[in-house]
Curated annotation (Swiss-Prot):
The keyword Cell wall biogenesis/degradation does not apply. The keyword Chloroplast applies. It is found in: Plastid, Chloroplast thylakoid membrane. This is ATP synthase epsilon chain, chloroplastic. It holds the Pfam family ATP-synt_DE. The lineage of its organism: Eukaryota, Viridiplantae, Streptophyta, Embryophyta, Tracheophyta. GO terms for cellular component: chloroplast thylakoid membrane; proton-transporting ATP synthase complex. Keywords: ATP synthesis, CF(1), Chloroplast, Hydrogen ion transport, Ion transport, Membrane, Plastid, Thylakoid, Transport. GO terms for molecular function: ATP binding; proton-transporting ATP synthase activity, rotational mechanism. It is a peripheral membrane protein. It comes from Liriodendron tulipifera (Tuliptree). Belongs to the ATPase epsilon chain family. Produces ATP from ADP in the presence of a proton gradient across the membrane. InterPro entries: ATP_synth_F1_dsu/esu, ATP_synth_F1_dsu/esu_N, ATP_synth_F1_esu_C, ATPsynth_dsu/esu_N.
Amino acid sequence: MTLNLCVLTPNRIIWDSEVKEIILSTNSGQIGVLPNHAPIATAVDIGILRVRLNDQWLTMALMGGFARIGNNEITILVNDAEKGSDIDPQEAQRTLEIAEANLSRAEGKRQAIEANLALRRARTRVEAINVISY
């Protein structure tokens, strides 16, 4: 039995295919979803989506949004998303270093909040590349 997973941004479809299982980062922690999961709607945090296809795990960096799960259908609408395999490791590492520097130079609450969000996004992209398959 499988799940139909659709990952969308406002501009494009990132993924639309059948999967065996997912592990999703929500605002209240990670959840695993298998076929016949109870219906839920949840906020999606900045974090990693792990997708199992048969014996292979894939990763995606998700940049916050919403998910709807029910009837073996999962729809995830996020601000932005990238497959781990599509992320350039050197560019992601540079972005992480810049985000860390910007956070240390942030002045005031607004700059600190924006710099912290940029750092979370950068760390998520690096993690999507480096995550070890289950």
